[in-house]
């Protein structure tokens, strides 16, 4: 993904080229460095939050040749069972920030996670690291991220929460929030909602609740 993320801007660059073949070839050589990425095998993916999504991301990353280190002090027994033994458990969140070449956050937005990716934690990251946020916009202090990008202490930021701060930043890729924008995803969401309601009514169980144990049977 990191190496292919520039396909669209690279295609736009190609459309701006004018002149004969020789001139175009020179322009390509002069401009292609701006689209250089890096390959995933051997890199370290840091995962903050090992819930249902975080576990799937961590396990999938192993198949791409990444080393994976994760942190979640409240990981459930169910999610721990599904987490590959090859995923290294960090002793602290700060350890993940320090070690990651690519850092991805998968936590719900609650008071404790608002601004979780802060100036102080960003300062721990490698200058070559890339931050991914496909959870909630407010989990990341966007001002701090933009400052880190401008200062060269963070390589890139990828999110699906376009804002005026990151939309046109040269080191940011902001996508539409499309994670559930398929017919299959919408159907699965409806099924999960129905299953959750039935489970709560039948035995008081609520899976994937972000406010558990406050969700109690009246």
What residue spans do the PLM features occupy?
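Residues at the starts of beta-strands that form the adenosine-phosphate
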Residues: 63-67
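Glycine-rich Rossmann-fold phosphate-binding loop(s) that bind the pyrophosphate
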Residues: 43, 50-51
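NAD(P)-dependent dehydrogenase/reductase Rossmann-like domain
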Residues: 169, 178-218
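Rossmann-like adenosine-cofactor binding region
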Residues: 69, 73-166, 181
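N-terminal Rossmann-fold NAD(P) dinucleotide-binding loop
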Residues: 54-55
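Phosphate-binding beta-alpha-beta segment of Rossmann-like dinucleotide-binding domains, i.e.
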Residues: 1-44, 202-209
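Short, flexible hinge/linker loops that cap or flank conserved catalytic cores
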Residues: 34-41, 62, 123-124, 166
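Gly/Ala-rich phosphate-binding loop of Rossmann-like dinucleotide-binding domains
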Residues: 58, 62, 149-150
